[in-house]
Amino acid sequence: YRWFATHADALLARALAWSHAHPVLGRHTAAVFDPTRRESVPLALLAILLLAIVWVWFAFLIIVIGHGEPLAMDLWVHELMRALRNPLADRPLAALASLGDEQALAPVSLLVLAYLCWRKRWMAAGHWLAALAFGLALTAWLGASVDIPKPPSVSSGFGFPSIAVTMSTIIFGFFAVLIARELPGRTRVWPYLVSGIVVALIGFARLYLGAHWLSDVIGGMLFGLVWLLVLGIAYRRRMVRSFWIKPIAWLFYGSFVLAGLWHAPRNVERMLAQFQAPVIERSVALQDWWTQGWQPLPARRNEFDDEQRWPLDVQVAG
């Protein structure tokens, strides 16, 4: 987004020139990027068009590459995360994954919306509400339209794209857009940096637990970023009044920390039980094991460190 914000003038000039040259579609794009035009209806139309384009693009990608199945990259990352599972890391990463739940994100979103309405920042409140509504509509619609087999340990409530990653990207990303405009110079990078770290941690934690495929996480980030680019540029183009960001920044980050501290410890056990790594049991008949059944069994420990891949020299029938 910062790259787009830096080059916004040139990009917007080209967009407006294209809009004037193409009056049929241009009247909608001009309304989004022209500060003298109202934006509610054009933004809704753009959101619908963006939703349709994204659906067609990802449906085409899945049909061509995956034929409706997880990609090879998804399977590889899933197996890698299963190999990395460690009891010492399970609880901290389950707590991090819980930060993407609605119990942690909903209070923050509602408090920011209430604060903006209380301060009569209707432009910011409208964009904030549009960001949340489109994110929820996007994930719900795509989850019902795109059918991809889920990881083995996942319940029916999870799918493509990851709603936790999508909403985390939208909420933290658009809040960074709101406050970065008021920060001086190089300090504007900090809200974006914090947003990226939080979303990356939530996405990695959910990959580690096996809650999503890698394509679910990347898809959630991608759709969130696309909507941020459109809505963020439209907001920055129209917003002319400055406001004091310290109260709302304390409110946003402070309430997120409090909600996370309240929800994560209570959700760790449930999440670990829900995404418990499946134990693969294999039995071999004694007679088959004596003849040739022992040969396919692993000859070394399954370790990433070659020094610890010790040979398994002894087999015991029991």
Predicted regions and their residues:
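Terminal transmembrane helix and immediately flanking juxtamembrane interfaces
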Residues: 1-124, 221-296, 303-309
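Membrane-embedded catalytic cores of phosphoryl/pyrophosphoryl-handling enzymes
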Residues: 1-12, 148-267
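Alpha-helical transmembrane segments of multipass membrane proteins
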Residues: 54, 135, 139, 202, ...
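Membrane-interface loops
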Residues: 64-82, 89, 103-196
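Juxtamembrane extramembrane loops of integral membrane proteins
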Residues: 312-314
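A cross-kingdom signal targeting lumenal/periplasmic-facing segments of multi-pass membrane
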Residues: 317-318
